[in-house]
């Protein structure tokens, strides 16, 4: 059983994956709040409480974090609480198998890398990955499996909250799909702007990639959405063909397997 840990700016997803290769399956997953000041001990208590008896069945662990301080605590946690479980954390120097054709590869978020790796492995074609998190990342992977770059926009919830915070006449609203693009009250107006506005933003970015990037204008390009915020706008997206809620967890598994296999089945054990 592989323990997969996906730490983002606001929330963390913990998953348990059974099997490997084409037989891999996400058996369970949980979403918890990310605390930037969390300690390794606190992480261990939380994760051990979630996975229960499966802690004794772990054969590996893979993790990423967009919060550097938490990545350090994840490493310490694995070293101290699961010292016999081989692990890999996505950071510079780790073999991911996806070339980063950008100005500064060290700037590329680990989440973006594993998403594109998983999409290329899933489809085997040029792909566009749209990850709906605290930011919306539209990332591009070539037909050769190369990360070409992408675009980053503020996330739906972040933008809606910022509008409410900076305007005396607006308030924070629950983000659900409104009955019409033409809102009849302030809440519906904000919901319409968030849902339909960001659907248009994503469709616009995907269409521009198709128009402007060589090799992306044909029908052999797959567009996949992932992330906790994706279901909010999926029905209104005209350019996205696929949705994979576990794309990032699958990418973590692929990186773990690549590093395990490259070392004849043995990753460096936790210290």
Swiss-Prot record:
Localization, UniProt: Cytoplasm
GO molecular function: ATP binding; metal ion binding; pantothenate kinase activity
Catalyzed reaction equations: (R)-pantothenate + ATP = (R)-4'-phosphopantothenate + ADP + H(+)
Binding annotation for substrate: 109-112, 186
GO BP, sorted A to Z: coenzyme A biosynthetic process
Species this chain originates from: Mycolicibacterium vanbaalenii (strain DSM 7251 / JCM 13017 / BCRC 16820 / KCTC 9966 / NRRL B-24157 / PYR-1) (Mycobacterium vanbaalenii)
Pfam families tied to this protein: Pan_kinase (PF03309)
Transmembrane segments: none
Protein name in the entry: Type III pantothenate kinase
């Amino acid at each position: 059983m592989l323990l997969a840990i996906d730490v983002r700016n606001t929330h963390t997803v913990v998953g348990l994956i059974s099997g490997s290769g084409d037989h891999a399956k996400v058996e369970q997953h949980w979403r918890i709040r990310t605390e930037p000041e969390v300690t390794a001990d606190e992480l261990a208590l939380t994760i051990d409480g979630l996975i229960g008896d499966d802690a004794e069945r772990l054969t590996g662990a893979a993790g990423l974090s967009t919060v550097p301080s938490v990545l350090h605590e994840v490493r310490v946690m694995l070293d101290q609480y699961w010292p016999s479980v081989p692990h890999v954390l996505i950071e510079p120097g780790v073999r991911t198998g996806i070339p980063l054709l950008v100005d500064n590869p060290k700037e590329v978020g680990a989440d973006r890398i594993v998403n594109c790796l998983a999409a290329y492995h899933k489809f085997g074609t040029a792909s566009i990955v749209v990850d709906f998190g605290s930011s919306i990342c539209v990332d591009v992977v070539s037909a050769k499996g190369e990360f070409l770059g992408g675009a980053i926009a503020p996330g739906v919830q972040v933008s809606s909250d910022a509008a409410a915070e900076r305007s005396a006449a607006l308030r924070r609203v629950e983000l659900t799909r409104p009955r019409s693009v033409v809102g009849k009250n302030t809440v519906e107006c904000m919901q319409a702007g968030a849902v339909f506005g960001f659907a248009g933003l994503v469709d616009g970015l995907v269409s521009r990639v198709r128009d402007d990037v060589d090799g992306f204008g044909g029908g052999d390009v797959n567009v996949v959405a992932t992330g906790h915020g994706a279901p909010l706008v999926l029905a209104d997206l005209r350019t996205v063909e696929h949705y994979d809620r576990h794309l990032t967890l699958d990418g973590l598994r692929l990186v773990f397997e690549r590093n395990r296999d490259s070392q004849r089945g043995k990753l460096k054990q936790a210290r």
